[in-house]
Design a protein with these regions (language model features):
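Proteins enriched for Cys/Gly/acidic motifs involved in redox and nucleic-acid/cofactor modification
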Residues: 23-27, 52-53, 120, 134, ...
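Helix-turn-helix
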Residues: 32
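Zn2+-dependent cytidine deaminase-like catalytic core
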Residues: 35-143, 147-163, 281-284, 336-338
Length: 407
């Protein structure tokens, strides 16, 4: 049974709801749910709330019950497989079963190994018809593959061609990255002139881009679980790198790489709002105590040439539940991340200016051949005020998540 026109319409609605979880649901994925009767009467809808709060399915069920609706025999459209494990909240698949839902339409299998097909299997075992978008099961987990393989084709349902599975992955790049690769999706933001300069030779950079681009940059900060920079940027610019120019339900974690713990106690980085995490590789114990006294968490990780081990940083952030990592740093850290192959996506704002001499985006190399250059594909080019916003995705990252090609 393929996605009907109604399924497609309702799944688009569920995905639109899921977008409202941006900046809210981390570390949980962004999920939307719509529940309606067979004749098209909507009973309830919702999206995943803050961690520890209800998931999308629970919100939709509660809304339907609050309106006095009978749920038995209804269909639920969910953008990600209902969870099957006890975490901070009970399993969503059990809630759907208990409510008497007769049919569940899912855009994507959950990449979380604690779920990975188990939610779908439990729904089917309860006699619920389950329809999954065709590309959703590609390359997820062994549990998901086994759950699908063990079901007769007629019970599994079929696809709408993968459109909604892809949309769910796009919306949850960080969650899929953390579940599949054990590290966040790293997005490197850079504002530069047309000739690739991020500042004048003396470091002056305020402001290369216009107000609209700066506001848009804050929206990208908001969607991330953490914003990361390096000690060089703090010492040179004393930034805050919090979310101020757009509304936000919470401030992302601000992460600073400071191998020798040189952050001054007066740094605006340490000021509220929002939590602060500083990664060091040793340093003076008194400085560590001083930073902790300012409210920062200090985590010591293995050192590497030039600073903290970047792979260890990403692994630790993943363990803390960070899905998307937004980086705004200087040329040295930019280059280190690119050379290490850790940049999944470039968020580049280009201003219609030429600076001539100045600071580069990421001075690494020299490369032996052009084939050695990090490979990116343009996925989006859009005008933001007077500036251009360019999104470019690392080819290897896109291939890993099955997201090749333009959006």
């Amino acid at each position: 049974m393929v996605f009907s026109d109604t399924d497609r319409q309702r799944m688009r609605q569920a995905l639109a709801l899921a977008e409202r979880s941006i900046g809210l649901s981390e570390p949980n994925p962004r999920v939307g749910c719509v529940i309606a009767t067979a004749d098209g009467r909507e009973l309830g809808s919702g999206f995943t709330q803050q961690a520890g709060g209800p998931h999308a399915e629970a919100v939709a069920l509660a809304a339907a019950r609050a309106a006095g609706h009978e749920l038995r025999g209804a269909t639920a459209w969910v953008s990600l497989e209902p969870c099957a494990h006890h975490g901070r909240t009970p399993p969503c698949c059990d809630a759907l079963i208990a409510a008497g839902i007769a049919r569940v339409v899912v855009a994507s299998v959950d990449p979380n190994p604690l779920v990975g097909g188990q939610g779908l299997a439990r729904l089917r075992a309860a006699g619920i018809e389950v329809v999954v978008d065709g590309a959703a099961a590609d390359g997820v987990t062994e549990n998901a593959a086994k759950a699908s393989a063990d079901e007769p084709a007629a019970r599994r349902g079929s696809s709408s061609g993968g459109e909604f599975a892809r949309a769910t992955r796009e919306l949850n790049l960080g969650f899929f990255s953390r579940m599949r690769r054990g590290r966040p999706w790293l997005r490197l933001k850079v504002a530069a002139s047309l000739d690739g300069r991020t500042a004048l030779p003396d470091g002056a950079s305020q402001w290369i881009t216009g107000e609209a681009a700066r506001r848009d940059g804050h929206a990208w900060r908001r969607r991330a679980g953490a914003v990361l920079s390096g000690i060089g940027t703090v010492l040179a610019d004393d930034p805050r790198l919090d979310v101020r120019l757009v509304p936000t339900p919470r401030q992302p974690l601000r992460v600073l790489l400071d191998s020798a713990l040189r952050t001054p106690s007066s740094a605006r980085w340490l000021a509220p709002p929002g939590p602060v995490l500083i990664y060091g590789a040793g340093g003076d114990a008194a400085r560590e105590r001083a930073l902790r006294a300012c409210g920062a968490e200090v985590a010591l990780l293995p050192g590497a040439p030039g600073g903290v081990d970047l792979h260890a940083v990403l692994a630790d952030l993943a363990a803390r539940g960070i899905n998307e990592l937004h980086v705004e740093a200087g040329a040295t850290l930019n280059a280190a991340l690119l050379q290490a192959g850790l940049v999944d996506e470039l968020l580049l704002y280009l201003a219609p200016k030429l600076l001539g001499q100045g600071l580069d985006i990421a001075p690494f190399g020299p490369l032996a051949t052009l084939a050695d250059a990090p490979a990116f594909d343009f996925t989006q080019v859009e005008r933001i005020g007077a500036d251009l916003r360019i999104l470019a995705r690392a080819r290897a990252s896109a291939q890993f998540l099955g997201l090749e090609g333009p959006l």
